[in-house]
Amino acid sequence: MKAFIIHRYGKNEVGQIGEMPEPDLKDDDVLVQIHAASINVLDSRIRSGEVKLILPYRLPLILGNDMAGTVVRVGPRVSRFEPGDEVFARPDDDRIGTFAEFISIKEESLALKPRNLSMEEAASVPLVGLTAWQVLVEVAKLKAGQKVFIHAGSGGVGTIAIQLAKHLGAFVATTTSTSNVDWVKALGADLVIDYKKQQFEAVLHDYDVVLSSLGNDVLEESLEVLKPGGQLISISGPPTPDFAEQQGLSWPLKQVLRLVSHGIRKKARRRGIHYTFVFMRASGSQLREISSLIEAGAIKPVVDRVFPLDSTADALAYVGTGRAKGKVIVKVK
């Protein structure tokens, strides 16, 4: 099958279209013909080798972390899906590879595609949708009337997280560039800060939750926004010892993560704030919840551009510019 493959770790020039064998099908697996996949920041982080300590992949590797497509075949223990079903998913960490014509996915990681979305729109949802759900619903337990600050409101996670937080009844603040202010307000944000003109920590106070998708440099400023008892939740690091425990990482690696996260954990603790690192995981059941919200009109995916599979490298480069509004899609079929 045709796929976008990396043979070594490196920056933008790494990766090419080539041939790989079709995936094996285990008893509880579903073989999906991929129609569309989406680009995530995680793809570039995997390609560069930035996360190889916590996600040790064997090369050559097919990149790609979410998709939408059609069921081709199911394993003998699969009961929820049958050939012809239109589905979407974020595969498990150790079984990525959606920039390809086929993928084998665990039944429990898969969900039926929202009926009101195209394949391209559906492919834009799984990773960012699950990230927003696991941060806001699972970890933050966001309630109506609470205040949440979502960094980078026009990005892939931001566009979904704003809509989910509004559905949950929260007051939502976010940041974006000058040209996107009105557009992000239209997604539902109550307060939009133009980061080119204002510093968020000078404007925002007494927030319950901050969702940070940016670098470590904004984490300390984010602490100033939160009230005592608030939660600073980062999806971009630094990872914590708790995360190492969940991932089953080695003792030495756990100590490394303890060191790299020590500074922000200590500063948060001094302010009575809880710091959590969230690395989203695959979940078909949560995707079904998200699908219901999409079908009800509470969440609308945002697609910026669509590239053909042969232009996957260009799609990755475009996302790397930071200019995409919402998600960038790779059309496979």
Regions found by a protein language model. Name each.
Residues 68-92:
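A glycine-/small-residue-rich N-terminal strand-loop-strand element
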Residues 80, 89-152:
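NAD(P)H dinucleotide-binding glycine-rich loop of Rossmann-like/cofactor-binding domains
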Residues 11, 20-68:
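N-terminal glycine-rich beta->alpha transition that marks the start or flank
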Residues 279-333:
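C-terminal hydrophobic helical "lid"/dimerization subdomain
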Residues 201-209:
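A short acidic, Gly/Pro-enriched loop at the edge of an enzyme's catalytic core
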Residues 126-197:
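Mid-domain Rossmann-like dinucleotide-binding core that forms the NAD(H)/NADP(H) cofactor-binding site
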Residues 218-296, 332-333:
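Glycine-rich phosphate-binding loop and adjacent beta-alpha segment
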Residues 35-36, 74-76, 92-93, 153, ...:
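Short, surface-exposed secondary-structure boundary micro-motifs
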